[in-house]
Amino acid sequence: MTIPTEISCPEEDAFQLLDKFSWFPSDDQRRWWEYTGPYLLKLLRDAKYPQKDQVPCLYLLQQLLVPYLGTFPVVGQAPLPWWSNVTTYGVPFELSWNLLHNIVRIGFEPLSHLAESGVDAFNKTAPEECVSRLACLDNTIDLARFRHFQHHLLVTPEEETWLLKEKAPLAKSGRGQQTLAVEFQNGGISAKAYFFPGMKSLATGLSPGKLILDSIERLALPGLKEPVHHLRSTLGLQDDGHPTDTAIAPFLLGVDLCTPERSRLKFYVTDQVVSWDRVADMWTLRGKRLEDPQCADGLALLRKLWDLLAIPEGYRSNIRPDFAFGTPPPEDYRPVMMANWTLSPKKKFPDPQIYLLTVGMNDAVVMDALVAFYEVLGWTDLASTYKDKVASYFPGPDFTKTNYIHSGVSFSYRHSKPYLSVYYSPF
C-alpha cells in the first residue's frame, strides 16, 4: 500500500475545497471570502504557483486575513465605517503581482469592530493582533523592527486623547497608522509592515519626514548615515524633515518583518509634480547614481515605460481624493506620483522604486502600454495573454470604458533585472 505524501486536487476545486465546509461568524466575512478567494486563486494560477501551494495561500486568506477586513463594501449602501490608506476608495485590501519573480502579494489593513465603531479611533488593536498571529504561523517572521517603529511612529494613549479632544472632528481618511502585506513564495510567506505617521505628526507637531528619519536614526545602524545623507540631499530635506520643495511629501515607512540584519527600510514620498524630469531626478538621486551602470540601464527602461503609458504631466492638486465607492474616478482625475528608496547599510546610495499611478487612466490604454512593455522586456508569453488574464479577474466591464482597474505600476531595477509590479483595484 502506498501512502501519498501530499494532497492534490484539481485546480478548479482549490477554492471549493476550502469553501465546502467553511463557517464564518458574520455575513461580511463570508462575502469577503467569496469575493477575494476566487480572485486570488486566478492570480496564483497566472503567476504559476504550484498546485500544492495554492490551497495553503487560500487557507491563509480565509483563516487569517478575511477576519480582519471589516465591513464588506456594497455599492449604494452606507459608506465604509473605516477609510483605509491601502486603496483610493478606502477599501482595506489590494492584490498585486510581481511579474519578474511571479510573486503574488496582498496588501491589507487589519480592522476590527473597535476601529469601525470609533472605540479604537486610530486602529491600533487589529494590526497588533494580526501580525502577532502571522508571526506564530511562520518562524521566519521577526517582529523586532515592527516593535521599534510601533513605539516611535504610533500615537500614544495620551496623544490619542489630545487628538480626539483638540483636533475633532478628524477627517475620515488618514487615521490609519499601520498596514501589512504578505507575499506567497517558496511554499511559505513573507510579511511587510507600513507605518503612516500622519497622526503622530498631528499630535506632536513634528513632520512625518522627521519622525521617520528620527526613528531610523534610533536604530543606530552602522553604515546608514551615508545613504540617509544622499536621500536628504536629493529630497532637500531640512532639519525639520520638510522638503524644500513643498510638492514633495514624505508620508510612509516600509519595513520587512524578518531578522533585523536582512530587514530593508523603505522611505516613501508623494510628488504633486508629475513629469519625466522629476522621475529622472528621483531615480538618479539628482545625478549622483549615474556613476553606477545599472542606474543608467534601469533609467532607459523606465523611460520606455513612461513613454508607453503616456501619463499626462502637470501639477496634481488632489492628494487624497474622496471618491464614493462604486463611482469611477472623474475622467479628468490624475493622481500624484510616488517613490520609495531602500536604505541599506551595505549600499552607498539608496535604491529607488518609482510608482506610476494609473487610476483615472483608461484601462484599455494602460493594458496596451503594459503589453508593449512586456514585449520590450522579452516577456512574450505574458504579452500575448495579459489582457485575457485581466479579463478573468474582472469579468464583465468593457475596459475601453473603465479607468480604475489598474491602480498603478511600480518599477525598480536590481541585479541587472527590471522589477515590475502591477496593482489592481480590489473591485
UniProtKB/Swiss-Prot annotation:
Can you tell me which residues bind dimethylallyl diphosphate? Answer: 105, 192, 194, 268, 353, 355, 419, 423
Any idea which UniProt keywords this protein has?
Prenyltransferase, Transferase, Virulence
MF terms from GO for this chain are: prenyltransferase activity
Q: Which Pfam families match?
A: Trp_DMAT (PF11991)
Reaction it catalyzes: 12alpha,13alpha-dihydroxyfumitremorgin C + dimethylallyl diphosphate = fumitremorgin B + diphosphate
- Membrane-crossing residues? none
NCBIfam families per UniProt? arom_pren_DMATS (TIGR03429)
Per its database record, what is this protein's job? 12-alpha,13-alpha-dihydroxyfumitremorgin C prenyltransferase; part of the gene cluster that mediates the biosynthesis of fumitremorgins, indole alkaloids that carry not only intriguing chemical structures, but also interesting biological and pharmacological activities. The biosynthesis of fumitremorgin-type alkaloids begins by condensation of the two amino acids L-tryptophan and L-proline to brevianamide F, catalyzed by the non-ribosomal peptide synthetase ftmA.
Q: Which family does it belong to?
A: Belongs to the tryptophan dimethylallyltransferase family.
Q: What name does UniProt use for this protein? A: 12-alpha,13-alpha-dihydroxyfumitremorgin C prenyltransferase
Organism name: Aspergillus fumigatus (strain ATCC MYA-4609 / CBS 101355 / FGSC A1100 / Af293) (Neosartorya fumigata)
